[in-house]
Amino acid sequence: LSLRRQRQMCIRDSLMGERSPHNNPDARGVFFGMSMDSTRADMTQAVLEGVAFGLRDSLEVARSLGIKIERTKICGGGAKSPLWKKIIANVMNLKVDVLEVEEGPSMGGAMLAAVGCGAYPDVETIGKKMAHVVDTVEPEPELVAKYEERYQKFRKLYPAMKDLF
């Protein structure tokens, strides 16, 4: 897999419906842009990029609400993939902090419980204590520009398909 190879394929990964930002439980996934010379590697990378594009959709909702986001955090299995970390950083044009913790949802729940029972005053305080960053991936301007163009095409797929579900 290569981030620099020009691919035309992408995926809308709504395999179990879509929740954010399109609340449509009937939405389904689709590969778009396949051709006879599409490879398994192309499809694999399209899946990784499609998930990152979906994350970007949610990021854009937050930005439209005036929320300023300069970096994001990832953990778990996907965070072990150097390729996927780079894809997320470049699609979102954000610094990506990789956390040491493997089980993010469980850790998040435990952190919220600790705040709720008064062991910590707020989420920021416990986050600084518990969410250890082990790596940071920076976006690369050349790839950010490439992915911006691809993301704009990706955004057009859902409106074009929504009446077909």
What does each of the following model-derived ranges do?
Residues M34-L55:
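Adenine-nucleotide phosphate-binding core of ATP-dependent small-molecule kinases
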Residues V144-F165:
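Charge-patterned, long linear interaction tracts outside catalytic cores
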